[in-house]
Amino acid sequence: EMNNLVSTEWLEKNLEHVKLLDATWHMPLTNRDAYSEFLKQHIKNANFFDLNKNSSQDSTLPHMLPSKNNWEKTISDFGITNSDHVVIYDNSDVISSCRVWYNFLYFNHNANFISVLDGGLKKWLLESRETTRKINLASKSNYLAKENKSMVLDKNQINLNIINKKFQLIDARNKERFYGLQPEPRKELN
């Protein structure tokens, strides 16, 4: 049974039995710094997952999947093993935790052991649950990844689908960006 969403109550009871990642990321121009916010307060035992740093540095597009080797190194540095239950949360309007959840699935982490905190840090704080400034020092692990390349489609496959209609494509941008009424805040995508 996949538990892709876990409640704040569940996480509070299981904090000592999961690996926790704060994957907060903010759109450019918001004047918010996710790492500074993490240093001020985060859920106990959380490590900060930097979406900018932990994405492909070789692509001209932002936030592309990292290489298998880079993913293994990053996740090993967090002390996460292949058998750990990983819970990801964020404190951003773009729900960046879902992107990191997808990365774990792409690199074949057991789908039963990768979850997103329902409501994120916002809900955790609204419920007056405990936060800390203490930095979690993880012991390095030896995480092994295997790419599930079927989870990524290229431009040709997308274009072919316009004719074949074999799958539904969902654009997750907000309505203003979707209709071109608001500029793309990431200059690499203009």
Range-by-range predicted roles:
Residues L20-D22, F48, V87-I88, F113-D118, ...:
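A structural signal for short, well-ordered beta-strand segments and their strand-loop junctions
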Residues A23-H26, F49-N54, N91:
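Acidic/polar N-terminal loop/beta-strand segments that form early-domain functional surfaces
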Residues P62-N156, L160-N161, L181-Q182:
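Thiolate-centered catalytic microenvironments shared by cysteine-dependent enzyme domains
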Residues R32-D33, D50, N110:
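Poly-acidic low-complexity segments
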Residues E37-K40, Y106:
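A general structural signal for stabilizing positions within well-ordered secondary structure
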Residues P28-N31, S55-D58, V94-C98:
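Short active-site-adjacent helix-start/loop capping segments
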Residues E1-S36, K44, L121-L189:
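Flexible, polar/low-complexity N-terminal or interdomain linker segments that lie immediately upstream
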Residues L39-I43, N47-F78:
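Aromatic- and Gly/Pro-rich amphipathic surface segment
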